[in-house]
Amino acid sequence: MIDVESLAFSYVSELTGDRVDALRGVNLSAHPGTLTLVCGSSGCGKSTLMRTLTGLVPQMTPGELEGAVRIDGRDLAEVPLTEVGHLCSSVFQNPRTQFFCDTVAEELAFCGENYGRDRTDLIESSERAAKLMGIYALMDRKLSTLSGGQLQKVALACALASGAPVLLADEPTSNLDPAAIADVRRALEFLKEQGMTIVVVEHRLHFLRGLADQVLLMEAGAVTRRWSGEEFYSMTDEERCSLGLRTLVDPGPPEAWVASGGSGGVGAGGEGPRLSCRNLSFSYGRTPVFQGFNADFHSGEITCIAGANGVGKTTLVRVLCGLTAPNSGEISLDGVTSSRSQRRAACALVMQDTGRQLFSDTLEGELTIGASDASGEVGEKLLADFDLANLGDRHPLSLSGGQKQRLVIAAARAARRPIVILDEPTSGVDARHLDSITATLRRIADEGAAVIVVTHDGEFASACADRLITLTPADGGCANEGKQL
């Protein structure tokens, strides 16, 4: 059981010296066998609340904490951080930050080994968690070879294997395909039946319909609304939109996605393709990732690339933008065969893990790395367009996941490259900023760029895509090349 009373947390910003009230008077009770959903806009304090429930705040994050957090009757203020793992397991927003081992099997056993659990019990719990999350076939794989979605499933499996009575999951589906999201739902159903206390922070809300027992809405560090699960999922679209929340309806698999906002693209009417691929193939050693891939990407057009986790979508866009060399095939720019260096110069890339491409110590500095004219009023307007203007003094790496995502997209727009490639740009993004990113990508396309987006987000793809390409695991090839949305 989790019991939170009058919880408040504040700290002094190292950059500005100002006091930041990250949590304000939060109260929460969560019982065994229940699931609590916490939602709200990016940067409202959801992740800080989760870090407080794990004891990382204030033990690892300096600041002033008021109120009480009790798990299974124990006050976390009196529990050494090394013992908190007995009480709760957690899945962070970025799963890469919580891994310690080389392979999936080693990572699954890591927690239990540190607590001296019996070897037989370790093996059984690891295999059970891996099967529950659909990653048993990955047990011998190195973590460094997995896709972002596969890593997210490994992090969830590690939490399940720990055997702790409480699960804290911070956006556990942000990089997952529809089938993997269904795996997460089944796992959460199983854990509820086993009597686990579960708290989930999410922007994607549809998959918890019928599972969430209570729903909390956070704004500016405070809980401002509470519903039962039934009340929450009965609200109208008008109510949901007024609260800035994403759809409550499952968009389904890629073949069910239907456009409501794509304009068709200004380049769809007859211009030759900006980027063209013919018979493109790539493999890791003897393992093929995709074979015989053919596609054209036009100026003014937004093309979404969908497919299961690990099918090769990220590898494909790395090849397209020149970061990785294909084994065979040809890639042309404006009808002329291109080199990798030419494609790197022509492409702006927004990576899946945006923290890996933040290099400056200011937000404006990030914009000017690829565009020297994106300073002063130009930079301020661009930051304002992405709802980042009030964060100008923050270090980029101190931003929330959604804020980092928007900053890197802003930098890509500032660079004004003819090809813009984005890998999961809406992971960790709330409804308002999803709409903002959709509008921005449409503007970039309308200005003449070819926009290529890897996504599992049906709500997003239906709002902006002109065309959908679906990669399949059979051969990594294009199962649904050129479907118009």
What are the roles of these predicted feature ranges?
Residues 142-146, 150, 395-399, 403:
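Conserved ABC ATPase signature
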Residues 202-203, 455-456:
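H-loop/switch region of ABC-family ATPase nucleotide-binding domains
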Residues 156, 409-410:
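Hydrophobic anchor residue at the start of the ABC signature
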Residues 54, 321:
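Helix-to-loop junction immediately C-terminal to a conserved catalytic motif
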Residues 68-83, 330-343:
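ABC ATPase NBD Q-loop/coupling interface
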Residues 120-138, 376-391:
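Conserved ABC ATPase "signature" region
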Residues 167-170, 420-423:
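Catalytic Walker B motif of ABC-type/P-loop ATPase nucleotide-binding domains
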Residues 159-160, 412-413:
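ABC ATPase C-loop
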